[in-house]
A protein has these predicted regions:
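Detector for methionine-enriched segments
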Residues: 1, 54-57, 103, 115
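Amphipathic alpha-helical segments
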Residues: 2-17
Length: 129
């Protein structure tokens, strides 16, 4: 699965800013079908999910928007999902990880709560000012 190959790349390149958790996604029934990255400096989480060999791999960037207030359980969150085809060639996986880091550093461009977008649409968001 793409997620397992991407996980190997991420493990080789994590630093003190990134915490890494590998787990089972509740809807997949497959082991290690979700990876959660927490970028401490940016206060942003990224969830990577692939539930089968033939399903798309989804990368969801999640960030807190606004501060927690009384009666507000955890604050307000914004997110955006980006999908990749399961046929993506392995040679592009290091670029996917770099893409994730770019998304985190430009998180404000990705919060719409809309349906998942393709990586091509996400690249367009990154390149638009």
């Amino acid at each position: 699965m793409l997620i397992h190959k991407l996980t190997k790349i991420i493990k080789q390149d994590t630093d003190d800013n990134i915490s890494f958790v590998e787990c089972d996604h509740p809807f997949s029934g497959r082991p290690r079908s979700q990876v959660i990255l927490t970028f401490k400096e940016q206060k942003t989480r990224v969830s990577i999910v692939q539930i089968s060999d033939m399903s798309k791999m989804y990368i969801c960037i999640i960030s807190r928007k606004g501060k927690k207030t009384d009666g507000d359980f955890g604050g307000h969150y914004e997110w955006q999902e980006v999908w990749f085809k399961p046929t993506l060639e392995d040679k592009y996986l290091p670029q996917v990880y770099q893409f994730i880091k770019l998304m985190v550093n430009n998180a404000n461009k990705f919060y719409s709560k809309s349906m998942a977008i393709s990586y091509k649409e996400a690249i367009a968001k990154l390149t638009n000012k």
